[in-house]
A protein has these predicted regions:
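Conserved glycine-rich beta-strand-loop-beta hairpin in the small C-terminal domain of fold type I
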Residues: 361-369, 379-393
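Conserved core segment of the aminotransferase class I/II
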Residues: 291-358
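Conserved core of the PLP fold type I
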Residues: 131-263, 275-276, 280-292
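Exposed, interaction-prone assembly regions rather than primary DNA-binding/catalytic cores
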Residues: 104-149
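Conserved PLP cofactor-binding pocket of PLP-dependent enzymes
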Residues: 408-429
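Short hydrophobic/aromatic beta-strand micro-patches
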Residues: 315, 391-393, 431-433
Length: 450
């Protein structure tokens, strides 16, 4: 079950511990199961007994295992496992002290075109809606059409009845997961994955299985075996992936779509970053490839425009949209009419916003990479295709680094927060949009804290 567990740049005990966590998290080694004796495990894996002892010891310290005299080492109940020392995405927005440099989130400031549009106001457009009760649970018809037109222009053919407007993409994610996943249901995600998606799945009580994801996208061999177990949902990002900034190659995307269609597993494709490319048009998605009844796309205004306008959407079949609409009515009735009217105006300026974002990110990406090379020359990363962050391998303990950084008032986002298994412990997600002076100050503080 461990497969090629020893592949990787890290020490064998750390690598073995991470592989065991993956098996435990995926349910292959259930709570209460006995692990092989250290000597037997070492012989089977071809490593020293010390390597196994160190891995077992690390997992016992983190609450995954328990050793009982005379009974060996067993998997501890999931309810007793100690959480990794990381903070979720939603936590990061509300618990950062004002005197702290926050490098834990990739959320962007408003694009210039956003300020221009908001200053113009919507007084004339608002007047007819003041004669109504103001509640439009599915979204204003004019915005549903504007989103459909925007998606169609960017390669995702859409009709207005396929769109449900939400109060941001996080609500879109939670509504979708509540409609598909029940307590204890199996849900597949990439590993690493978007923190908000993982939080939504945990909230609905999903049993999450992470599928190894590299610069080439999901490991389709592992995914095929997981799909055979008929999960409730597959959550993925084939366009611009958060946190890695990569995009799935065309051939792999075609293979993935074929697997989804054959399996019949509902698939939630998070497209929130798909138009945040470093250059060129928006990234390709699964929209033309997967059967419409199986695919749900999530989107937002936050990336191109501003997160302060809480506008997101769900794109799905009309039948599924009707189901989601009933859930949405229980959630918060409707999204702000004023924000929706601003959104209509903003979507007309999407090409301008995309050019502004690409220019800003291209400039800041270069200064971010230069600053990181200067302060941490041994850190490495793959060139990104888009998004607002670098997925950086520190080749060390990123959790420990984040704790040290916290003492000098710098907040980091270590890799375990992006993993269903607390994996990627050497990784950091660093935002690329900060001004060079602030970023260099933060990196200098981190350097001094070590």
């Amino acid at each position: 079950m461990l497969g090629d567990w020893s592949d990787g740049p890290h020490a064998l005990p750390e690598t073995l511990a991470a592989a065991l966590v993956s098996l435990i998290g995926a349910g292959f080694v259930p709570a209460g199961s006995a692990l092989p004796a250290q000597r037997d495990c070492a012989t089977a894996l071809g490593v020293s007994r010390g390597t196994v002892a160190a891995a077992y010891g690390a997992l016992e310290a983190r609450g995954y295992l328990v050793s009982v005299q005379g009974s060996g080492t067993r998997v501890r109940s999931g309810s007793n496992q100690a959480p990794a020392l990381v903070e979720g995405r939603l936590f990061s927005f509300t618990h950062t002290p004002v005197d702290t440099i926050d490098l834990s989130t990739g959320a962007l400031p408003a694009s210039p075109v956003t300020g221009e549009v908001l200053r113009e106001g919507v007084e004339e457009e608002l007047a007819p809606y003041l004669e109504t009760d103001g509640y439009f649970p599915a979204g204003l018809p004019v915005l549903r059409q504007a989103v459909a037109d925007h998606l169609s222009r960017t390669g995702i053919p859409t009709q207005a009845q396929q769109v449900l407007i939400t109060s941001g993409s996080q609500q879109a994610t939670f509504l979708t997961m509540r409609s598909l996943v029940g307590q204890g249901d199996l849900a597949l995600t990439e590993d690493p994955s978007y923190r908000g998606g993982l939080e939504a799945l945990r909230t609905v009580g999903a049993r999450i299985e992470g599928i190894r994801t590299t610069r080439e996208g999901l490991d389709l061999g592992l995914l095929a075996r997981a799909l055979a177990r008929k999960p409730a949902v597959l959550y993925c990002q084939t366009g611009i992936h958060n946190p890695t900034g990569q995009t799935m190659p065309h051939g792999a995307r075609l293979d993935l779509a074929t697997m989804i269609n054959r399996s019949g597993v509902p698939t939630v494709e998070d497209c929130c970053s798909y138009d945040l490319t470093v250059s060129g048009p928006p990234a390709t998605t699964l929209a033309r490839l997967v059967e419409p009844e199986l695919l749900i796309n999530l989107g937002t205004l936050s990336k191109l425009f501003w997160g302060g306008l809480r506008i997101g959407w769900i794109r799905a079949s009309p039948t599924r949209i009707r189901t989601l609409l009933e859930l949405r009515k229980v959630e918060d009735l409707a999204t702000s009419v004023i924000d929706q009217l601003h959104a209509v105006s903003l979507l007309r300026r999407a090409p301008d916003a995309r050019r502004q974002r690409q220019a800003m990110l291209a400039s800041h990406l270069k200064t971010t990479e230069d600053a990181v090379h200067e302060h941490f020359p041994h850190w490495t990363w793959d060139p990104i295709k888009g998004g607002s962050g670098l997925w950086v391998d520190t080749h060390g303990d990123a959790l420990a680094l984040a704790e040290m950084a916290k003492r000098v008032k710098v907040k980091l986002a270590p890799g375990p927060g992006f993993s269903p298994y607390d994996g990627h412990r050497s990784m950091l997600r660093l935002p690329v949009w900060h001004e060079p002076e602030l970023l260099r100050q933060a990196l200098q503080l981190i350097t001094g804290s070590k």
